[in-house]
Amino acid sequence: MDTAQAAQVALWVIALLVALALAFDFMNGFHDAANSIATVVSTGVLRPTQAVVFAAFFNFVAIFIFHLSVAATVGKGIVQPGVVDTHVVFGALLGAITWNLVTWYYGIPSSSSHALIGGIVGAVMAKAGTGALLSAGIGKTVLFIFVSPLLGFTLGSLMMVLVANVMRKASPSKVDRWFRRLQLVSAGAYSLGHGGNDAQKTIGIIWMLLIATGYSAAGDTTPPTWVIICCYMAIAAGTMFGGWRIVKTMGQKITKLRPVGGFCAETGGALTLFLATALGIPVSTTHTITGAIVGVGSTQRASAVRWGVAGNIVWAWILTIPASAFVAAIAYWVSFQLY
């Protein structure tokens, strides 16, 4: 194979990896659509079809609102410069996609975000060991595995207590009528946070690939515009198709929600995502909204939360990073042997 042919093959490999990354982004929207719309559907504020269009719109609008701090963390802040190559990116994406498909099939609301982080970690470790990982980026990501659901829980429960006190003299029918309208605001805010944090993770891994292959300079402060637009379009399109198995778990099986509870859960989750995105931390939208839903349910009574379902979700969270890392390491090794 001469130089021109080798360059052409390399370009095709890069194009296929970009397509695979956008497929992951689409799947992220599909898999995590439930996070944005489960409460607004389960409370009857919007029909499922209306809800996915609503969420997809705000997923894309996030492109105009948030700085690309999360993309910078994923693209430049997790792995040592010079370690990433096409095999690493392939392994990372395959590990994340495989885990997403498994959890989607079983209707488990796991984290697409942490599946991607696990995939990156697994592929990088397979190539160069733990020394190739940047402790600062990995550290804050791991820390927020625990912080984001706890913060969502705290904000969701505080919002519920505050609203209950403010509205204590209002009739239940009046409260429901008011919060059916207000939940459109909270659902829109949460969908903004979902798009702003999650689309940037795919932007980050494509940017990582382009830097590694010389199509973007390591000193660039932002990724190419086409990458940003494509990633936000992909996650919005994925959200349009939805993930109804997970909607049922998130919106009904953990705890029954009224519009006021949906508003408090979405607002608590949205505030958590806005904070994390501003800090450049790739967090799990799934962890965040689940924590907020449990927080809202726990203010009613402990038995209002189906702790068995919540426990199964926690186990899926615990397994996400090691499982996706394991698949990514195998995928890296196989691709390295074949190409």
For each feature predicted by the language model, list its residue ranges.
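Multi-pass alpha-helical transmembrane bundle typical of ion/small-solute transporters
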Residues: M1-Y339
